């Protein structure tokens, strides 16, 4: 059996040994992105690598808003979010199916019965042998979780979900709260704007002036964040046909966009504490 975690920041698959599996060619995570160009649909990593170059042809809401209603976006005329989720899972299962059978699916704690029924139908249509669905928060518990009430925080593309777990006996979900609109996509946009502002202030070069440099900055963002975990500042270089522009970037401009999210999370924690932590 394998585990499949449906988080739109990057769908993951793990084997019985709990090691992550290659879910796309050369990738351990498949982000919930779709791009349609000239009638051709791309999903996952390939779509994300085009998302800033062709934003009007990009959809990254289909897992967050999983439904069968027709999309109003002209670029996706005749499509539904369920269709895009089907295409994404089809690509993932093509990678996993040759060597794996039986799948336990970890789903967002915000999914209600309509989303779960729709997801089950998609997986049945793809002949994915689903053994069952489980809460993201429960799936994330370590084998020896503390025997107390715990709070699990899950960052998605367009929301942050807080789930209360009672682990004093067999672990169960007591409830959850969603900080809507505060997810990784909003943070990425704020971080990119902060970096672009630094470039404009110091070099007069605007990475947002050209779609290719905007995409390059987006693609480089995970590396920059990893570097700033280890050091107080790092160099950011943006190449154009005429020149290469460089700045030294500190943590501070990237920490400021986190404050509204942290405030919203703390407010939800206060509410959950009143309801579940006595």
Task: Describe the function of each predicted region.
Residues 72-83, 245-263:
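Glycine-rich phosphate-binding "P-loop"
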Residues 10, 17-106, 228-232, 236, ...:
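Conserved phosphate-binding loops in N-terminal lobes of ATP-dependent enzymes
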Residues 84-99, 141-144, 255-278:
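Phosphate/ATP-binding catalytic cores across multiple sugar-kinase/actin-like superfamilies
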Residues 166-251:
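Phosphate-binding glycine-rich/basic clefts of nucleotide- and phosphate-handling proteins
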Residues 98-109, 208, 212, 271-278:
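Short glycine-rich phosphate-binding loop at a beta-alpha junction
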Residues 65-72, 91-95, 125-126, 194-202, ...:
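Conserved, well-folded catalytic cores of nucleic-acid-processing
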